[in-house]
Amino acid sequence: MMVFRLLKNYSLYFAWLTALIATLGSLYLSLVRHIPVCDLCWYQRVCIYPLTILLGIAAYRTDRGVVKYALPLVVLGFLFSIYQYLQQMIPGFAPINLCGSTSPHCSEIHWEIFGFITLPFLGMLATLIMSFFLIMAFYSLDKRLAN
């Protein structure tokens, strides 16, 4: 019960920390390790990077109303991630080609561990974790308004 209370009270901080780790990790991989960034990766970044600032400010101010603005970005980032992951893991899965001709193809795997963990998989994982914490923040907001 104490762990649940801790997660509920600090859910915005945990969501912000997840966004921060995802942002810094993607910047490290592209700027330091020089892993090429495809178009779908850029779309995922567009969804995740603003969350680092939004969730950081919201966590500092304990503004749980940010969930209404952050959750759509998280869901959109998840959709881009799962689409790219399916493109990488299922040969021939690409009904819609979202990659341009100047960037690397979105189905190319540039980094992989254990045979299934790729960069889009980590993006999916980060968005699922953020969704969990944002939903916890939303429901703790409802409880506070009811009291």
Swiss-Prot record:
Respond yes or no to whether keyword Cell division is given for this record. Answer: no
Q: Which GO terms describe its biological process?
A: protein folding
Lineage of source species = Bacteria, Pseudomonadati, Pseudomonadota, Gammaproteobacteria, Legionellales
Task: Spell out the GO cellular component terms annotated for this protein, sorted alphabetically and separated by semicolons.
Answer: plasma membrane
Q: Where in or outside the cell is it found?
A: Cell inner membrane
Protein name in UniProt: Probable disulfide formation protein
According to the UniProt entry, the coiled-coil residues are none
Pfam families membership: DsbB
What disulfide bonds does the UniProt entry report for this chain? C38-C41, C99-C106
